[in-house]
Amino acid sequence: MNKTSVPSIDSIDRQWYLVDAENQTLGRLATEVASVLRGKNKASFTPHLDTGDFVIVVNADKIRVSGKKPQQKLYRRHSGRPGGMKVETFEHLQERLPERIVEKAIKGMLPHNALGRQLFRKLKVYKGTEHPHAAQQPKTLQLDPAASAQ
């Protein structure tokens, strides 16, 4: 009988990937990035370990959504105080904090536990093309071109 191999923490090789979000659909980009953060693109994927890679997303301010979502999609947050609910549309949040839109979409696709919080720390999102991670020599991650054309 074969035994399942569990990779040791030292044997996990973490890569850095660069994703350009310009003209990409939000949900399709988020699923691909969440999969890489989780490590599902590797043969050594283990559900209970962090085997994923680091991902840098640039041009978060140029992400797309379809239909009337720019005006109708709502983002809610609460201060914790009575009456502290704040509601903002996609359009308004994209002007103010475009990184938060991408972060929130990807975070929702990660596990909602301590492992998910650890995976989320490996995501870096920037609104322009500049990022401070050139020393890591990130590889460009090609997303499915058919997904962005829809």
UniProtKB/Swiss-Prot annotation:
It holds the Pfam family Ribosomal_L13. Keywords: Ribonucleoprotein, Ribosomal protein. The keyword Repressor does not apply. InterPro entries: Ribosomal_uL13, Ribosomal_uL13_bac-type, Ribosomal_uL13_CS, Ribosomal_uL13_sf. GO terms for molecular function: mRNA binding; structural constituent of ribosome. SUPFAM superfamilies: Ribosomal protein L13 (SSF52161). Gene3D superfamilies: Ribosomal protein L13 (3.90.1180.10). The keyword Ribonucleoprotein applies. HAMAP family: Ribosomal_uL13. Belongs to the universal ribosomal protein uL13 family. Part of the 50S ribosomal subunit. This is Large ribosomal subunit protein uL13. It comes from Synechococcus sp. (strain CC9311).
